[in-house]
């Protein structure tokens, strides 16, 4: 099938024609369309010149959400803590560790994985505005778009099944407001 990554020679030609960004935008929109479903919300966009797409899964019973997000060679698992939940939960990194320990979120099962490999530059948690905590694996070079989409759909099913556990982790860790 068609490769998820463009060959470097193609990228150079596209850059020379100033078309790389346009083609990447179409590529990501195409991937988003193939993954779109009435069961969950998808999105795509651009940040700092790089295109990305993702799947948004609300964590029922909380005001926070979880995303699978793909940007370049990064396959991300991301918890988006709402300001409200952030205030109640305190140490978000500890919450992320508990989530990783007790659920499939943040777990990429890299053994015998034909799609993902460990990221060499992994930082434990990346945060934006200290609210979005993500961890990522790297998408392997030879992966086809079709195989990546199948992998994402399977991952979404596993994650959706574990979101109730995440809600329970939130509830167990909300700081008591009573003195």
Describe the predicted segments one by one.
Residues 12, 16, 20-21, 136-179:
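Long, solvent-exposed, polar/charged low-complexity segments
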Residues 2-142:
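Polyanion-binding interface signature
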């Amino acid at each position: 099938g068609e490769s998820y990554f463009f060959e470097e020679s193609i990228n150079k030609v596209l850059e020379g024609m100033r078309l790389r960004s346009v083609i990447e935008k179409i590529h990501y929109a195409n991937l988003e369309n193939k993954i779109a479903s009435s069961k969950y919300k998808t999105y795509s966009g651009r940040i700092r010149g790089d295109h990305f797409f993702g799947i948004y899964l609300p964590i029922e019973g909380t005001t926070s959400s979880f995303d699978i997000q793909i940007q370049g060679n990064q396959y991300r698992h991301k918890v988006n803590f709402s300001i409200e939940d952030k205030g109640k939960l305190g140490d978000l990194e500890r919450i992320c560790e508990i989530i990783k320990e007790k659920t499939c979120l943040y777990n990429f099962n890299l053994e015998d994985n034909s799609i993902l490999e460990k990221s060499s530059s992994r930082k434990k948690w990346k945060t934006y505005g200290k609210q979005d905590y993500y961890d990522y694996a790297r998408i392997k070079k030879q992966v086809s778009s079709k195989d990546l989409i199948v992998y994402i759909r399977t991952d979404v099913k596993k994650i959706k099944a574990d979101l109730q556990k995440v809600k329970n982790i939130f509830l167990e860790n909300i700081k008591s407001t009573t003195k």
